[in-house]
C-alpha cells in the first residue's frame, strides 16, 4: 500500500510538472507585441489643412477623431490577444494624440527627431505592425493630401529605383527587424499603393478620394468601427503575414522642390547630386537609410535648444 502511495505521488508530481511546463509554454506563446504608427491625413473626414495642424479651425476636433481611430486599433488589438502595445504619434509635430484618452498600459512615442521616424520603437521583439491614418505618396495623382514625408519640400523619394510612400518606406524599416505589416487604414488610394508594394494586408478604407482636397468619407464612428474590425481580422491570422524585405545595401533617391537643398547636401561625400533638384545616397540597410532620411528632413542650423 505504501509503495502504491509513493508511485501515485510520483505520478501526480510528474503530471503537475508537465502541466506547469505546458502552461508556461502556452503563456509564452500568447505574448503578442503590437506597434501602431498613427498618421492623420488618412483619418476619416480629413480633406484639407484645416484638420491637420494647430492653425486649422477643425484641428481640435480632428485630434479627437485621430485619437478615436488609434483607440479603436488598440482595443481591437487587445481583444485579439495583444499583451503589449506601443503607439507612435507620427503626424506633424508628433504631439497630436490625446494621450489621456488611451489605456494606462499603452506606451506612446511623441515628437521629433527620433530614430526610425514614423515607426520609432520598432524592433525584433515586435510581432506585428499596424498603420493608422496613412495617406498616398507624393506621385499619386488621386490620393487625399498625397505626399511623401514633406509636402512642402519633397517631390519624390525612391528606394532601390522604386517610388515609395510613407507606408512602403515604413514597411521596409519594419521588415529590417522581421516585423510584418498586418493592417492599415486610410483612403482607397493609400491602401492600393501599400498593397501593391507589400501584399494583400487587411485594410480599413476610411474614405474614397475624390481629389487632393476632397473625399467621400465615413463618419468618425464608422471609421473607428471598421478599423477595429480589420485589426481583429489581421491579428486573428497574424502568422500568415510576412515581413516586407528590400535588398540591401539600399539606394535612395530624393527630389526636392527647390534646387538649393540638393546643391548643399552634395557637399557631403555620402550624397551624389543626380540632377538640379535631386540627390542619391546608399546605406547598408533600412535602419541606416532611415537615419539619413531623418537628417535630411530634420536638420536646420538654427535648431534649438
Language-model regions, residue ranges each:
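A glycine-rich helix N-cap at a beta->alpha junction
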Residues: 104-122
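Active-site rim beta-loop-alpha module in soluble metabolic enzymes
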Residues: 173-181, 185-235
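Sec/Tat signal peptide C-region and signal peptidase I cleavage site
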Residues: 21-27
Amino acid at each position: 500500500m505504501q509503495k502504491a502511495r509513493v508511485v501515485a505521488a510520483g505520478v501526480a508530481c510528474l503530471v503537475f510538472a508537465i502541466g506547469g511546463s505546458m502552461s508556461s509554454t502556452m503563456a509564452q506563446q500568447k505574448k503578442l507585441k503590437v506597434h501602431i504608427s498613427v498618421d492623420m491625413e488618412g483619418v476619416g473626414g480629413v480633406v484639407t489643412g484645416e484638420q491637420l495642424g494647430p492653425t486649422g479651425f477643425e484641428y481640435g476636433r480632428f485630434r479627437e477623431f485621430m485619437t478615436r481611430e488609434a483607440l479603436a486599433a488598440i482595443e481591437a488589438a487587445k481583444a485579439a490577444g495583444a499583451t503589449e502595445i506601443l503607439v507612435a504619434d507620427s503626424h506633424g509635430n508628433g504631439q497630436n494624440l490625446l494621450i489621456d484618452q488611451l489605456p494606462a498600459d499603452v506606451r506612446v512615442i511623441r515628437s521629433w527627431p527620433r530614430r526610425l521616424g514614423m515607426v520609432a520603437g520598432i524592433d525584433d521583439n515586435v510581432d506585428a505592425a499596424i498603420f493608422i491614418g496613412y495617406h498616398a505618396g507624393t506621385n499619386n495623382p488621386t490620393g487625399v493630401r498625397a505626399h511623401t514625408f514633406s509636402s512642402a519640400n519633397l517631390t519624390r523619394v525612391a528606394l532601390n529605383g522604386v517610388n515609395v510612400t510613407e507606408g512602403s518606406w515604413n514597411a521596409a524599416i519594419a521588415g529590417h527587424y522581421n516585423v510584418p505589416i498586418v493592417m492599415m487604414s486610410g483612403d482607397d488610394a493609400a491602401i492600393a499603393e501599400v498593397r501593391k508594394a507589400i501584399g494583400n494586408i487587411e485594410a480599413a478604407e476610411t474614405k474614397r478620394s475624390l481629389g487632393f482636397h476632397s473625399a467621400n468619407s465615413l463618419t468618425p464612428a464608422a471609421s473607428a468601427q471598421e478599423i477595429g474590425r480589420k485589426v481583429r481580422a489581421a491579428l486573428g491570422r497574424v502568422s500568415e503575414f510576412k515581413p516586407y524585405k528590400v535588398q540591401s545595401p539600399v539606394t535612395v533617391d530624393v527630389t526636392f522642390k527647390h534646387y538649393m537643398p540638393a546643391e548643399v547636401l552634395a557637399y557631403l561625400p555620402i550624397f551624389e547630386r543626380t540632377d538640379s533638384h535631386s540627390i542619391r545616397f546608399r546605406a547598408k540597410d533600412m535602419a541606416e537609410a532611415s537615419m539619413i532620411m531623418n537628417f535630411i528632413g530634420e536638420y536646420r542650423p538654427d535648431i534649438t535648444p
